[in-house]
Amino acid sequence: MRHPIATLHMENGADIVIELLPESAPNTVNSFLFAASHGYLDHHAIERIVPGNWVDMSYTAFGHKETQYLIPNEFSLNPEVEPLDSHPGCVCMGGYGEAGLASCEFFFPLRDCPDHKGVYPV
């Protein structure tokens, strides 16, 4: 299966390169690609940093009504998919974990987060 690559160009000149894994979270990857291909992620600042925990790229749907949607938790829809571990160096889709909903928002964990496994698609 093809693994799309997304590159975030930071204002300081650094790049963050993300390999997307559609076999692990097909709907979530499609949601991210939708937002990226329509420019909804362009020129967006980091929304918040929770020291020692994660960096949120958005918790306000990037300010676009087109991204204010929710998709069901990947693992409820696809129970055969083994959830991946959340740890530094990966990207996780944000949303409302306890409600089992996500969107195109995402965050970078700054620590191992075993409590995220099966809640936030990695």
Where are these regions (language model features)?
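Cyclophilin-like peptidyl-prolyl cis-trans isomerases
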Residues: 1-122
